[in-house]
C-alpha cells in the first residue's frame, strides 16, 4: 500500500472511516447470509398490498423503537427468473444494513410465471409501490423519497418500474396513482427481450413462456 499510495496514505483517511477499518469483521455472520441478523431493527411480515394472496404481500424492515417520520424508503424486488423466489430470501444483508442506517425498507412478493403471464409481474410491483406511497408514512417512511432495487428478474422489474411512471397500461384499476420514484438501482437484470443485437443463442421460447 505504501508503494502504491505513498508513505503517508494513512493520514489521508478520515477519522470516522479509520474507525470502521479497525473494526473486526464477524466472519460467522458473513458466512451465513440468510441469517444475517442486525441489532436495532424491526421487521413486520406478510402485509397485504393486493388481492392475490401470498403473492401480494410485503415485509417492512425499519429501525427499532418509536416511529420517526421522514426516513428514506427502499422498495426491493426479488429475482428468480420471474418464476421462483420470495421476499424473505434475498438481499437480506442489504435490507437489514439500510434499516440499521435509518431507512425504511419494503420487500415484496409478486405473482410468478408460468401461472402469471405478462404484464402481471410489473402490475403487482406497481400496485406494491402504490401501497407504499399510501401507507409507508405510518412506519416512518417518507413517501416523497422512494428508491427501488432488485436483482436479475427484480433488476428488470426495477428498470421497467422506473421507466414507466404513471403508465395506465400497467396500472389497471389504479391508473390515477402516481408511480414515479426518486431513484432506481437494478442489479444484473435482463433488459433486451427482443435481442436486437443478435447476442442470444438458441430459442426465444423462454420469453413465450413468460407471456
What are these regions (language model features)?
Residues 1-211:
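Alpha/beta-hydrolase superfamily serine-hydrolase fold, recognizing
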